[in-house]
A protein has these predicted regions:
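Alpha-helical scaffold/interaction cores of sigma-54-like transcription cofactors
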Residues: 1-442
Length: 442
């Protein structure tokens, strides 16, 4: 059966990781994960992902070490779907697959961009055109594009059109026509020039965000047991490969199995380096390079990280130079902090590491959880562990809280607050402490 086959593969794989001497806590975690996977009906899903990764490894395709919550699965680690030991790095299985949240697991696979087609071809050859398809995606009419299209339909010449387009203020992120109108005096003058201009702008606002064209999702592939044509509308894509007529979100809501194959240029570079070394008689496995390698850490300390995935921007290089990371954990923390929201804590993290600011914890019981990050909340796993330790949440309950916080779901956050405080009081915490900690993690 699928259950027995997955169990056999995972057990054998984990034994290889530990030279046939599996520590007790790893065996316990593996058994727990396999039980949850089976109870949720996902044995076949893991076998499908294992199979394609096994193919990639068999033809020397360099794959990523693991992305997102899938790195929290010891089964994934045992099957070589990921290369990250979740127990060593305190990664939580419940963040990936939560029995309290009936949802398909989501494993994204990183593949070199110059060999992604080989993997896609393998999937279609294995499962057939009736059971696999790429996914449709829509390009929508953003502010400038919709304004340009409407100007053309209204018969404006190029000079007039670009007057309208130049009136849209520059913005780092996406800007709507309504926001542009509020910010741009020039746009306000154009709109109010005459009645036709008002109609033109109103028409553009009406059409904004509607689909303009369709293309193929850059990464997603759908696989089904039954014939896909019986489940979802299909159309022919490039080279005759079928494409769903439903978008990624709709495909997921139908409960279809979706796997993302992400083509990364950085893995192509890495694969080329490994191949060049092999040609010179040097056999190297990037996954076996020690994470405390001093020469590599020195590169990060200098911010010398061109072509290093997610460390290429000038901003993150400056953070690396200021932090002067002396461990792999420091590098991981920078990657987690360098994004909107958590960026506010970068200075605290740097100053505390260098002893310029006192390390503080919302409650002494959190030192074990926040100690490696100098009292700064960096990872979503830390939110889950805090809810477990301070308020007695199960990790499944803690994951639901984490999701509400990451999606800024105010109703759920407020509802969980009362539950958190009540649980903390039952464990002997003071109400003021519980409130302080909840406000900190929320």
């Amino acid at each position: 059966t699928s259950k027995e086959y997955l169990h056999s593969l995972a057990q054998t794989g984990l034994a290889k990781r530990f030279n046939n001497q599996i520590p007790a806590k790893y065996q316990e975690r593996l058994d727990y994960e396999l039980k949850v996977i089976n109870e949720m009906g996902f044995d076949d899903y893991f076998l499908i992902v294992w199979d394609v990764m096994n193919f990639a490894h068999s033809v020397n395709i360099t794959t990523g070490p693991g992305r997102g919550s899938a790195a929290g699965s010891l089964v994934s680690y045992a099957l070589r779907i990921t290369e990250v030991d979740p127990i060593e790095y305190n990664l939580l299985f419940e963040r990936f697959l939560n029995p309290a949240r009936q949802q398909m697991p989501d494993i994204d696979l990183d593949i070199p961009d110059n060999r992604r087609d080989e993997v896609i071809k393998y999937m279609f050859e294995k499962y057939g055109m009736n059971h696999a398809a790429q996914i449709l995606t829509f390009g929508t009419l953003a502010a400038k594009q919709v304004l340009k299209d409407v100007c053309r339909v209204f018969g404006l010449n190029k000079v007039e059109t670009y007057r309208w387009l130049d009136a849209i203020p520059h913005s780092k992120g996406k800007i709507t026509l309504a926001e542009a109108y509020q910010k741009s005096k020039e746009l306000q003058l154009l709109v109010n020039t005459n009645e036709l201009s008002k109609i033109l702008f109103a028409t553009a606002e009406h059409l904004e965000n509607l689909p303009r064209h369709y293309s193929i999702h850059a990464a997603g592939l759908v696989i089904t047991d039954d014939s896909l044509a019986e489940i979802v509308g299909l159309q022919a894509g490039p080279l005759g490969i079928p494409v769903t007529q439903q978008t990624k979100l709709n495909v997921e809501s139908l409960g279809l199995l979706k796997i993302d194959f992400l083509g990364l240029r950085n893995l192509t570079i890495l694969g080329n380096i490994v191949a060049a070394l092999r040609a010179d008689g040097i056999d190297i496995d990037p996954n076996r390079i020690p994470l405390d390698d001093q020469e590599t850490l020195a590169l990060f300390q200098r911010g010398d990280t061109d072509a290093v995935f997610q460390f290429e921007s000038d901003g993150i290089k400056r953070v690396l130079e200021q932090l002067h990371p002396d461990s792999f954990e420091d590098i991981v923390a920078v990657n987690a902090l360098y994004r909107p929201g958590p960026m506010n804590n970068i200075d605290h993290f740097i100053n505390r590491k260098h002893g310029k600011e006192r390390v503080q914890y919302p409650d002494p019981s959190l030192k074990k959880i926040l100690g490696t990050t100098y009292g700064v909340l960096v990872y979503q796993e830390q939110v889950m562990q805090t809810a477990q330790v301070l308020a007695g949440f199960s990790l499944g309950e803690a994951d639901l809280l984490r999701r509400a916080m990451s999606k800024k779901n105010a109703d759920v956050i407020q509802r969980e607050r009362a539950k958190f405080i009540e649980g903390a009081i039952k464990l002997g915490r003071k109400k003021e402490t519980a409130e302080k900690v909840y406000d900190y993690i929320a």
